[in-house]
Amino acid sequence: MLGLSGCKGGAVADNAEEKASGKGLVIGWSQRGISGSDWWKTLVEGGQAEAGKVGARIELLDANGDTVRQNADVQTLITKGVDVVVMNPNDPLGLGPSVQALKDAGIPVVTVNSSLDKSLVPDMFCYVAEDQEHTGSLAGESLAQKALEKYGDQGQIKIVGIGGFPGDVLSDLRFNGFMTGWNRVMDKHPGVTTVKLDTKYGEWKPDKALAPIRDVATANPDLKVIYSMSDVMHGGIVQGLQQAGLWGDGILMASYDGGMGAIKEMVDDPKGPLQADASNQPWDQGAAAVRMALAAFNGDQSQCADKTNYIDTTVITPAEAPDYYVPTDTYVRAKD
């Protein structure tokens, strides 16, 4: 009996040691939604690829935009005995029951792309995302340089941003970041006066973005710079500017997401209006979430200081677009 007991203990120890390296680790992935979103699909695929590299396995459950269902999904993952949970929260506060259940079960939780309410953060190991304000600033800085090249360092530059919804955090962070980057450049050129128009909103949909951008362009025929806070609205913005007679050589545009369609546009038309696209790299966010899940299993908080892990992001201009364009991908990935 002692021999059998010793053998079992050794096997358990070996298993724990293997999981510490990722081999055999079971990661429960609670996704807010996948259907209809190439971005979320890419996020999950990045996580799955990273798990495969270290020998871990992902148990994926999709809540399809339903917070009640996502809470039930987390309970299912707990019942299945997963080692750690990666969660893409549908509702920052509504997943409180799941966070408490995971805490009671001794299962660490990593959030990715969207975080939890601040009241729940103490029970979260790590939040993985891009720093949206910093990423937006990359686009602003890049487009400001393009504007100086195109319009010179004297005169007025009228600019408008188009976001998702009034007051939504994503729009605020992305636009504030853009203007920080823009002003960082333009502050060195006092001959340029930036006239910032009121932000317009397109509900993150191309058809909803068309009318607002058309109307502001019609009312401001001297509009020179447009910043779209998501590539998904790009088609509607282009149509709106075309209808207002402004799409073409007189306009400069930056966008946000790093969608492959935007990258291809810059490859095909390097002198066109679109001159910068800030990339938030969902594949890399998913991969980082799995790395943080492994760190959480090992209790290594040093891997996620301050409970936040921002991935490195970049901005792509027509000069870099050929290097980042991969027809089989939907979004830009980090370069090795």
What residue spans do the PLM features occupy?
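Sec-dependent bacterial lipoprotein signal peptides
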Residues: 1-5
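A residue-level marker of the well-folded mature domains of exported/periplasmic proteins
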Residues: 6-336
